[in-house]
Every structure is written in structure tokens, then in C-alpha cells.
């Protein structure tokens, strides 16, 4: 999967990085959204050692915390919420955006209503939408949304994570379902390929980046000061 990303997505990664660099340099934010395990790339990028100011997580707890299969915050509630039209609109109403901000969404299949609603609301506010997901394998799937288009079809920019449709990758004897999902690894790979490119572009332009430093380096006594700055 990583080899395929490198072989097929570098041009698109550079294009997306330029768009994000322009956004951050102009003093605006790249907002990030995902639900389920697609929230993990968001947690990975910021706040994080080596991450930069400019990326703003939109983390909705009922869509990101579902370690209980049954009971409160269970998988049944999560599956209902991510497929329910209107929830994404309510999420977006809770934030203030600028038309020059960007929205970066992570979704393996791009079919669930909450992601589509969030993207549509971003467009209504004048924002461009970037999507990371398995567009090549799932890009023609019918959405769970009355609008008739999936997330990849309404995005302004798409970076393909090159994962299989089922996500899981390893077949077991006497079992129908596979194990070993790939989408989280692939999405995080795309995250850092994009963000490191963004940082290189901004550094080449002479912009001072606010980088989250490590606080665990022996002898480094200025990490807190650099963080506060």
C-alpha cells in the first residue's frame, strides 16, 4: 500500500500541500474531520511532537469514542450516527469558519452521511474540501445520503490511500472476514507525507513555523519556552 501511494499519489500530495501551505501562510486554518478510526489520523497530526500550528481538529466525541461494543457509547449508536443525515450539519453549526479555511476529511469509503454533510456545509461556507480515502477502490460506491454523490465525488481534492475495499487484508482459513486493516496506517502515511511537504514549502518561503517540540530530549531545557512561543 505504501509503495502504491508513493508510486501514484505524489503529484496530488504536492498539489494538496501547496493549497494547505497557502492557507496556513495567509493566517487561516486547515480543519480536520473523521469518524471512527478515521479520527486517528487527526489525533496523530496535532497536537503532536513534530506537528505545526495551522491544523485544527474537529473531533466529535460520539463519533470517535466507541470502545464499547454494547452498552453506552456502543458500536450500534456509532453506526447510526455516522449514517444519519443532518448530524454533520449540526456539527458544523457549532464552529466558526472563514471562507479561506480548508477542510480535510478522512474516510475510507466516502459513503457515510455525516462526512458528506460536513463537506457540503464547508462548501456552503466557501471552503475547499480535501479528502483522504480509498478513492480508487470505493470511489464509485453509492452513498448513504440523499444527495446522490459520495465524498470523493464532491471533494475539491482527493488523495487516494490505495487500500482494498474491505480495508482488512489477511485471509484466514475457514473464515469469511479478513483481518489486518490498512486504512489507518495508509492515512497516517499520507498525513505526514502531506504535512512534511507543507512545512518544506513554508520554510522555503521564509515563514516561521510554530513546531510542537519534544519534551523528552536529555539536556534540552528550552522545549517549554519554544512551545509557549
Name each model feature, range by range.
Residues 8-25, 91:
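A short, well-structured juxtamembrane/interface segment
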Residues 1-8:
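Generic N-terminal amphipathic, Lys/Arg-enriched alpha-helix
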Residues 8-16, 30, 202-212:
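Flexible, glycine/charged-enriched surface loops at secondary-structure junctions
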Residues 3, 18-21, 120:
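Surface-exposed alpha-helical segments enriched in charged/polar residues
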Residues 28, 36, 50-51, 71, ...:
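Glycine-centered flexibility motif
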Residues 167-171, 199-226:
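Internal, active-site/partner-interface "lid" segment
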Residues 9, 225-228:
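NAD(P)-dependent dehydrogenase/reductase Rossmann-like domain
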Residues 25, 32-195, 199:
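Glycine-rich phosphate-binding loops that contact phosphosugars or nucleotide phosphates
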Amino acid at each position: 500500500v505504501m509503495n502504491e501511494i508513493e508510486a501514484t499519489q505524489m503529484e496530488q500530495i504536492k498539489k494538496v500541500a501547496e493549497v494547505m501551505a497557502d492557507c496556513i501562510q495567509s493566517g487561516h486554518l486547515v480543519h480536520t474531520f473523521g469518524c471512527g478510526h478515521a479520527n486517528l489520523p487527526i489525533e496523530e497530526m496535532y497536537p503532536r511532537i513534530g506537528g505545526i500550528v495551522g491544523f485544527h481538529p474537529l473531533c466529535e466525541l460520539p463519533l470517535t469514542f466507541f470502545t464499547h461494543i454494547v452498552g453506552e457509547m456502543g458500536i450500534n449508536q456509532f453506526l447510526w450516527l455516522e449514517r444519519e443525515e443532518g448530524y454533520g450539519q449540526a456539527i458544523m453549526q457549532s464552529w466558526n469558519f472563514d471562507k479561506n479555511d480548508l477542510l480535510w476529511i478522512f474516510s475510507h469509503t466516502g459513503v457515510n452521511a455525516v462526512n458528506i454533510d460536513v463537506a457540503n456545509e464547508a462548501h456552503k461556507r466557501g471552503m475547499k474540501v480535501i479528502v483522504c480515502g480509498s478513492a480508487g477502490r470505493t470511489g464509485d460506491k453509492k452513498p448513504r445520503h440523499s444527495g446522490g454523490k459520495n465524498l470523493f465525488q464532491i471533494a475539491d481534492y482527493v488523495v487516494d490511500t490505495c487500500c482494498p475495499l474491505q480495508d482488512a487484508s489477511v485471509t484466514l482459513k475457514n473464515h469469511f472476514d479478513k483481518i489486518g486493516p490498512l486504512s489507518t496506517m495508509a492515512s497516517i502515511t499520507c498525513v505526514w507525507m502531506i504535512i512534511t511537504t507543507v512545512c518544506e514549502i513554508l520554510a522555503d518561503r521564509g515563514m516561521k513555523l510554530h513546531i510542537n517540540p519534544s519534551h523528552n530530549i536529555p539536556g534540552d531545557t528550552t522545549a517549554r519556552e519554544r512551545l509557549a512561543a
